Curated annotation (Swiss-Prot):
Family: Belongs to the LamB/PxpA family.
GO molecular function, one term: 5-oxoprolinase (ATP-hydrolyzing) activity
Catalytic activity, reaction form: 5-oxo-L-proline + ATP + 2 H2O = L-glutamate + ADP + phosphate + H(+)
An example Gene Ontology biological process: carbohydrate metabolic process
Record function comment: Catalyzes the cleavage of 5-oxoproline to form L-glutamate coupled to the hydrolysis of ATP to ADP and inorganic phosphate.
Pfam families: LamB_YcsF
EC number(s) stated in the UniProt entry for this protein: 3.5.2.9
Organism domain of life: Bacteria
HAMAP family: PxpA
InterPro entries given in the database record: Glyco_hydro/deAcase_b/a-brl, LamB/YcsF/PxpA-like
Subunit comment: Forms a complex composed of PxpA, PxpB and PxpC.
Descriptive protein name: 5-oxoprolinase subunit A
Amino acid sequence: MYQVDLNSDIGESFGAYELGMDGEVVKYITSANIACGWHAGDPMVMEKTVQAAIRNKVAIGAHPGFPDLMGFGRRNMVVTQEEAKAYVKYQIGALWAFTKAAGVAIQHVKPHGALYNMAAKDEGLAKAIAEAVYEIDPNIILVGLANSKMTEVGEKLGLKVAHEVFADRAYNSDGTLVSRNTKGAVIHDSDLAVARVVRMIKKGKVEAINGEDVSIKAHSICVHGDNEHALEFVNKIRETLGKEEIQVISMDALLK
């Protein structure tokens, strides 16, 4: 039987500003990537999001990003490897305080936005992130773009690595994500998104924006919680995966 994890970036509200449909999306996923206060989120949001994940029996992961609230962590920054490593440790530590108090563990770490996309190509940045995770707890799973520098470096270091694919994003022919500034970067057609997901899991292929087929490994599917179609996507994905006899389980269970 095919197996896959379903994750979403949640806990990205901030103060009086609400973002996403976390309360609904969390009912359908198996792993939650919780913002740690730098690109989004705040202490109260983190506390509430951890509790929501626990109530819904969803595995918890840290979602560290660049210190860029105004840009939602989607703007590239020039940082040293030492800085990047410290940034990631700091944010994992923030989430750890809430999970420790709640008596649960951090299952995984998935970088956010520009940090994620840059680390997919930049070996030095990927190494800094992977080392931060390893030094905190080598049992934590590192999540990265499938077949990227991030996953390659994590595996070399000895971490358990989850290769991630995206239901609602278009791909370039080199396996990277199409920039959000490019037309067609975000897929709004739920039927198309679901069909692509099933093909990625069963065939290990995804059609790039130029029509080429790209080989891809799919341990975990991401549905963005801030996408206006997130709830429709995740609902339809869960329904279709069941029909296709694809079991949805957490990363930890999948990678054992």
